[in-house]
Amino acid sequence: MATIPVLPVSDTLKEVKGGCILRTLDRRHFYAVQTPQVFPREVILTAYRQAKRFGTVGTDDAALVEAAGFPVQIIEGERSNIKITYPDDLLYASVFLKSIQHTK
């Protein structure tokens, strides 16, 4: 089965439109998704084929698997599994790595 690691969201989440807050979302129902994500070979291949065929766009592989109709289960992620997306993330990761090296 498709499986992804997640962490409960700790930030307050707001739905915004036109620069104004529409509502505050209940963060108990939201999770931050991590990698690595694990999929049976045929599931991920089918998901990508369908995404190409229908023009489906996803921000991660799991979104494409969901869109293709496959179930995706979650497991508890790890806070130290830092996602590197923006240049500032590299600085944060560097500081984190130095801090754990000093504790060993």
Question: Positions of the model-derived regions?
Answer:
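Anionic-ligand binding region
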Residues: M1-A32, V38
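Conserved alpha/beta core of the MobA/IspD/sugar-nucleotide pyrophosphorylase nucleotidyltransferase superfamily
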Residues: Y31-K104
